[in-house]
């Protein structure tokens, strides 16, 4: 996968290119990241990249000409088929389904805004899609862009150490992840669930699915509203609810 970055602070993306899963992907040639700074496309000695908004008000906007020229340079480098994305609070909210959808693109250009944003006409003429990582304000689009790159890169074949890792991530099936355990077997009196030590892979799969369903029901119940549960999933969720109610009753009785 090839990803182009339009940013006033391209050095921030060393967190992606030099470390962790994405750093290994870059090193192994599975992910290529290039960056363009609008500051390199300015024509004044101060390398100005911001301008006042029409209509007044606080803050500045990114200057149109350097930004457009940077986008055009990235498009030229990408060639045919690159999708241009603007990271914006007004965009479609990123979720696992959206990540999976974006991962089908071989070329992405990510435009990172700064100040109060960018000229609406640049969005209309240069941007294919707007994406947001949440309903809150950040100082720029770099962190959202890094979030998008990290999540999308997990779908690139060969990036993760285990082929099933991406499909078993939280939200991959619309559910939260199940609890995980490693050594020691007993930690301050808390034991690993016996089923995980049993070696019975069918029972382990069933336990993990039940816990995943139950955790989603407890913490993010709205996610279940959008799912058509299978017969097995519905049965396991009912079991979890019954066991949870029994535990709550036992806890209340001890209180």
From Swiss-Prot:
One GO term (biological process): tRNA N1-guanine methylation
Reaction equations catalysed: guanosine(37) in tRNA + S-adenosyl-L-methionine = N(1)-methylguanosine(37) in tRNA + S-adenosyl-L-homocysteine + H(+)
Enzyme class, UniProt record, top EC level: transferase
Residues binding S-adenosyl-L-methionine, per UniProt: 113, 133-138
Localization terms from the record: Cytoplasm
Record keywords: Cytoplasm, Methyltransferase, S-adenosyl-L-methionine, Transferase, tRNA processing
A cellular component annotation (GO) from this entry: cytosol
Keyword Transferase belongs to the record: yes
Pfam families found in the cross-reference section: tRNA_m1G_MT
GO molecular function: tRNA (guanine(37)-N1)-methyltransferase activity
Enzyme Commission identifier(s): 2.1.1.228
InterPro entries membership: Alpha/beta_knot_MTases (IPR029028), tRNA_m1G_MeTrfase_C_sf (IPR023148), tRNA_m1G_MeTrfase_TrmD (IPR002649), tRNA_m1G_MTases_N (IPR029026), tRNA_MeTrfase_TRMD/TRM10 (IPR016009)
Disulfide bonds: none
Role played: Specifically methylates guanosine-37 in various tRNAs.
The protein's assembly and partners: Homodimer.
Record-stated family: Belongs to the RNA methyltransferase TrmD family.
Name assigned to this protein: tRNA (guanine-N(1)-)-methyltransferase
């Amino acid at each position: 996968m090839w990803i182009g970055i339009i940013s006033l602070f391209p050095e921030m993306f060393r967190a992606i290119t030099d470390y962790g899963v994405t750093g290994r992907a870059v090193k192994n040639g599975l992910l290529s990241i290039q960056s363009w700074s609008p500051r390199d496309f300015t024509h004044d000695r101060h390398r100005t990249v911001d301008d006042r908004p029409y209509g007044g008000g606080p803050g500045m906007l990114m200057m149109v000409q350097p930004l457009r020229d940077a986008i055009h340079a990235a498009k030229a480098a990408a060639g045919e088929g690159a999708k241009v994305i603007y990271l914006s609070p007004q965009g479609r909210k990123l979720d696992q389904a959206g990540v999976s959808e974006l991962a089908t693109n071989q070329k992405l250009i990510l435009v990172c805004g700064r100040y109060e944003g960018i000229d609406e006409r640049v969005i209309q003429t240069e941007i294919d899609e707007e994406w947001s990582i949440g309903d809150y304000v950040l100082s720029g689009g770099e962190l959202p862009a890094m979030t998008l790159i990290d999540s999308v890169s997990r779908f690139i074949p060969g990036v993760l150490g285990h082929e099933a890792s991406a499909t078993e991530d939280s939200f991959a099936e619309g559910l939260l992840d199940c609890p995980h355990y490693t050594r020691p077997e007993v930690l301050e009196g808390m034991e690993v669930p016996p089923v995980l030590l049993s070696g019975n892979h069918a029972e382990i799969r069933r336990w993990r699915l039940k816990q995943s369903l139950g955790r989603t029901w407890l913490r993010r119940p709205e996610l279940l509203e959008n799912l058509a549960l299978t017969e097995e999933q519905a049965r396991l969720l009912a079991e979890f609810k019954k066991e949870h109610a029994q535990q709550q009753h036992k806890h209340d009785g001890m209180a």
